[in-house]
Amino acid sequence: MAYDNFKAKIWSKAIDKELERAFVFADGTNQQYSGEIKGLGDTVRILGVGKPTVTEHSLINGDITLSTPEKVSDTSVSLVVDKAAYFNYAVGDIDKAQGAGKVLAVLNEEASQEVANKIDCHIANLVNPDSGTVGLQMFTKTQITNANVMATLDACQALLYANDVSPATPVEMILPPWLYMLFRQAYQNKDTDNSEYLTNGKVARYGNMTIKMSNNVAIKNDGTRDVYYVQIRTGRAIAFASSEAHTEAYRPESSFSDAVKGFKLYGAKVVRPKELVVLPCYA
């Protein structure tokens, strides 16, 4: 890369585009608030209301007499952008002279992957018992085997339906590799023909659920073993907001090299806990 040819806006957009392809946990979140983020510490107010009461009336009893209008409860929550993922790397002039001129572009892609990894880890760990997230629906801690994997996943999805999540609402499960292997062995009718399931960790469909695989599933040792905290959720369960990636090119004073530094601001929060079930499990 020639320093003079560096276009920060283009590189920032390239990073954001790469992030979109790399996200697994962030991919299935509500991201409608991202355009409002300008700086670290920004707060997004996510407006919501409760359900109004609907009363049944029999016309045999005469005309309807309305009571005082109900004040429907406010369910608004705040999402704070309190995280930043950043990078700072350089390529020496000698390396470029030896034919590594495109290495900065490659490093840009690698940096994007690592930023996506940091963001995904943050969202995955919103359900870690140490996260402080309140209102989580925790399924019973379960040892998963070939014999019970399908019944366990079905039971988790049934909890969502019990919370009035519509069967027509898209749901996704994000499994660690070992659990996906058990699922794959137990379920032979996976829909993997569609090329859509080659992106964002998607590996299969099961009913109306999209099955994803990720190494970033939250883990906590319970004193005996590592327990994985699998998310089964709708696209409204977690809100995620981020800024546009920011990049700058510069020449470090201490070396003969071109360097690029950049960051992305973000925040995430469980905003609809009834649309998220957490499965603590182990092999």
Q: Language-model segments: what does each one mean?
A:
Residues A2-N30, G35-T55, T75-V80, Q98, ...:
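Sequence/fold signature of self-assembling virion shell proteins
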Residues I10-W11, I15, L19-E20, I119, ...:
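Generic structural signal of hydrophobic/aromatic residues within well-ordered alpha-helices
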Residues F23, D27, V115, I119, ...:
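Residue-level signal for secondary-structure boundary elements
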Residues L59-T68:
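Short Gly/aromatic-enriched secondary-structure transition segments
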Residues T68-V106:
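Long, hydrophobic/aromatic-enriched structural stretches that serve as scaffold segments
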Residues V91-N163, V278-A283:
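Alpha-helical scaffold segments that mediate packing/assembly in large oligomeric complexes
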Residues D93, L175-P177, K264:
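Short, structured patches in soluble enzyme cores that scaffold and shape functional sites
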Residues G132-K202:
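Extended, solvent-exposed, turn-rich assembly/linker loops in the middle of proteins
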